[in-house]
Amino acid sequence: MAQRIFTLILLLCSTSAFAGLFDAPGRSQFVPADRAFVFDFQQNQHDLTLSWQVKEGYYLYRKQISITPTKADIAAVQLPAGVWHEDEFYGKSEIYRKRLNVPVTVNQAAAGATLTVTYQGCADAGFCYPPETKTVPLSEVAAAIDATPTPAVTQTGETSKPAAQLPFSALWALLIGIGIAFTPCVLPMYPLISGIVLGGRQRLSTGRALLLAFIYVQGMALTYTALGLVAAAAGLQFQAALQHPYVLIGLAIVFTLLALSMFGLFTLQLPSSLQTRLTLMSNRQQGGSPGGVFVMGAIAGLICSPCTTAPLSAILLYIAQSGNMWLGGGTLYLYALGMGLPLMLVTVFGNRLLPKSGPWMAHVKTAFGFVILALPVFLLERIIGEAWGLRLWSLLGVAFFGWAFITSLQARRAGMRIVQIILLAAALISVRPLQDWAFGSPSAQAPAHLNFTAISTVDELNQALAQAKGNPVMLDFYADWCVACKEFEKYTFSDPRVQQALGDTVLLQANVTANNAQDVALLKHLQVLGLPTILFFDAQGQEQPQARVTGFMDAATFSAHLHDRQP
C-alpha cells in the first residue's frame, strides 16, 4: 500500500515537471486569443449565427469586427449595441463582454462559399491581441425567388457605427439659446413680438398670456427640431464621408467663417426677398389665437437674423457631422426653448424685466463667435493629434480671455478689477502650451522616446542579436491598436530612470500594426500571444524567459524589473 502511494506521488511530481518543461517561455497571466474569445458558428439554410464566448476580464471591439463573404451574397449585418469603453488614446469605443451573437442572413451561397470573420479584443489588464481571422465554410444555399442580389461587400462594425456624440451636453443648447436672446438683433424685438402674440390686447389674464407665449415658442421649437432631425438624418447617410480628413477640414473652415460673421466681419442671413415672404405669411396670422400664434412661431423659426444665423448654422452642421437624430432634434428644441424663455417673461411681466440695451449686447454676440470657434478645434483635433490640438485650444483661450480683458477695461463698475485680474490670469495660464512649443520646456530636454532599431522578420532579429556584440538586447512589440503600447511610450520609456537602466542595452522594436504574414511569423516564432510584450536577451543572444513582460508596467515597476532581471 505504501509503495502504491509513493508511486502515485512520484507520478504527480513527474507530470508537474513535464508540464513545466513544456510551458511557454515567460509564462503569461493572459490566455491565448482562442480561449479569451471562443468563436463558433451555426448555419440553418439562410440563417447563420456567429457567436463569441468572451472570457471574464476580456472584451471585443465592436468596430474591429469585419465580415467578408466569398462566393456568397449576404444581407447587411447589423451588429448589436455594445457598452461604452474609454481610454486615453482612442477615446470612447463600443465593446462586447461575456457573449456576442451576430445573426447573418445568407441570401445565396455557391459551392465552396466562405465567410471571412475578423475580430480583435483586449484584456482589462491592458493586454491586446492581434486581429484574429476565422474562415466559416457556408452550406450551399439557393437564392430566393424574390431576393434582390446585393454586391458582396465587407460588413464591419463601422457600417453600423453608433451616432457620434456632440462635444457638449445638449443642455448647453438651452443656455446658448438664452444667450442668443440677449444679442442686439434679438432682444430689442421681444416687446414687439410680445404685442403681436397677444394680438394687441393689453388686458389678458396672466395664464392666457403665458399660454399664448408658450404656444408661440413651441411653434418656433417645432421648426428648429425639424431642422435638427433633417440635418442629423442627412449626416447619418454620409457618416463615413463626414469623417474624412478633407471633409473635417472643410467643416472647420465653414465654422470659422460663421464665427467671423459673429465678429461683425460680414452679415449672414436669409435673402431679403425670402424674409419678406415669410414675414408677410406671419402677418396674415391672427394674434391672440392659439392656432395663429403657433403658425407665427413656426414661421419665425425660419426667419433668421444676422445674430442667429451663424450659431444656428454651426449647430446644424455639427449635428449633421455627428449623425445623431435623437440628440439632433433634442438639441435644437432646447436651443429654441432657450431663445423663447425671455419672450415668455416679457409677455407675462412686461418690459420691466428686460435689461437696458447697450454695447454689452454686441459683446454677447462676439462672445458667441468664440464659442463657435471651439467647433473647428474639436474637428481638427482628430486630424492633427493631441499635441497640436492642445496648442489650438491654447490659442483660442488666449484670444478669448485677452478680448474679455480688454473689453472689461471699459467698465466702470465696482469689483471689475477682480474680474480683470481673473481674466488676465486665465490668459496667462492659457498661453503656457504655446510658450512651451515656441521656446521649449524643461521637460522637453530629456529624450521623449528610446532610440529603437526597427526589425520586422525573424532573420532581421537573428541578425540584430548577432550584431549586439556581447550586449544585452530588449525587443519591444508595438502596434497602433495597442493602447498599453502607447502608454509604455508616453509614461514608461520617457522616464529618466528607465532610460538610464537601459543605457547598455541594444533596443529593438517590431511594429506589428499591419499584422501581415511576416508579423504573424515573428509573433509565432517568439510565442507572443498579444501586446504589449517585451522580450530580453542576454549577451549570448538567448532569451531570458523569466524577464519577459506582458501587459503594462509604469516607470517605477519597469525600472525595478530591469534591475532585477538576470544579467
From Swiss-Prot:
EC number, as in UniProt: 1.8.1.8
KW Cell membrane (keyword) present: yes
Gene Ontology terms: cellular component: plasma membrane
User: Any transmembrane segments, and where?
Assistant: 166-186, 210-230, 246-266, 299-319, 326-346, 360-380, 387-407, 418-438
Keyword Transport in annotation: yes
Family according to the record: Belongs to the thioredoxin family. DsbD subfamily.
Q: What is its main location?
A: membrane
- Protein purpose: Required to facilitate the formation of correct disulfide bonds in some periplasmic proteins and for the assembly of the periplasmic c-type cytochromes. Acts by transferring electrons from cytoplasmic thioredoxin to the periplasm. This transfer involves a cascade of disulfide bond formation and reduction steps.
Keyword field: Cell inner membrane, Cell membrane, Cytochrome c-type biogenesis, Disulfide bond, Electron transport, Membrane, NAD, Oxidoreductase, Redox-active center, Signal, Transmembrane, Transmembrane helix, Transport
**Family annotation (Gene3D superfamilies):** Glutaredoxin, Thiol:disulfide interchange protein DsbD, N-terminal domain
> According to its UniProt record, where is this protein located?
Cell inner membrane
The cross-references to PROSITE patterns, in alphabetical order and at most eight, read: THIOREDOXIN_1, THIOREDOXIN_2
Give the residue range of the signal peptide. 1-19
**Molecular-function annotations in GO:** electron transfer activity; protein-disulfide reductase [NAD(P)H] activity
Q: Which reactions appear under catalytic activity for this entry?
A: [protein]-dithiol + NAD(+) = [protein]-disulfide + NADH + H(+); [protein]-dithiol + NADP(+) = [protein]-disulfide + NADPH + H(+)
Q: What name appears for this protein in its UniProt entry?
A: Thiol:disulfide interchange protein DsbD
Residues forming the Thioredoxin domain are: 435-567
Q: How does it sit in the membrane?
A: Multi-pass membrane protein
In the record, biological process GO terms are: cell redox homeostasis; cytochrome complex assembly
Q: Name one Pfam family in it.
A: Thioredoxin_2
Q: Which PANTHER family match?
A: THIOL:DISULFIDE INTERCHANGE PROTEIN DSBD
Q: Which InterPro entries match?
A: Cyt_c_assmbl_TM_dom, DsbD_gamma, DsbDN, DsbDN_sf, Thiol_diS_interchange_DbsD, Thioredoxin-like_fold, Thioredoxin-like_sf, Thioredoxin_CS
Disulfide pairs here are C122-C128, C185-C307, C482-C485
The record ties this protein, via SUPFAM superfamilies, to: Thiol:disulfide interchange protein DsbD, N-terminal domain (DsbD-alpha) (SSF74863), Thioredoxin-like (SSF52833)
